[in-house]
Amino acid sequence: SSQIEKSINNSFNTMIYRLSGSDSPSNIWRIINAGNARKNFIKSYSIKNINNESYLEVSFNKDLLVEVFNKLSIPVISNSRPVMLFLIEIDSGAGEPYYLTHSKNNLELDNLLKNYLKKESSLRGIFLELPELDLVEVNQLLNYKRLIDLEDIIYEKYIFDELIKIKISKIGIDQWSIDGDININIDDKDFVKNFIDKFKEHTNFRINKILEKNQ
């Protein structure tokens, strides 16, 4: 189905990003324009069920991808580059709660967080990633599901060195509650600035720790 094809394409794009360290679509187009269809790189795919939810698991032929990278002179980064995955749930009270992904923007906050992660990632030489949740039945997942259900999927699907979990909820007219790896209440006035400052501080602390460990 078109949903499966879309999920496979997203998984492929993520794999190219992981191998090249660049999220520029030009590498993907170079590979495809050289006559390589995405499906040629698939070893297998299967639909898995966790807690009665479906998601697609795709396995790629990484050796073949590296071979094509070398042919096209696309640099392959070291496999030892650390990966931090951010699972950020946002409930502004204005609509359904949602998880921050690359493909969706709801609030000004979403863009600021993504821009920071992208910039810091290239600056520090570490992957700061968000889950690509259109691989999951997102709407079903977000309706009355506890965070642990999504975590099962995250651990099954992603390889990462550290998982950072944050839940951002508006708890009154003028207050936000932050839970998980950051625990703090913030006033609505200047909320975005104050939260971003706190988020940067925590993320930098975690990046420093993981880089020390990997030296």
Q: How would you label these PLM feature ranges?
A:
Residues 37-48, 85-88, 127-132, 142-181:
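A short, hydrophobic beta-strand-centered structural micro-motif
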Residues 57, 61-64, 154-206:
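Amphipathic beta-strand/beta-sheet edge segments enriched in Tyr/Trp
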Residues 1-3:
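Positively charged, aromatic-enriched nucleic acid-contacting surfaces
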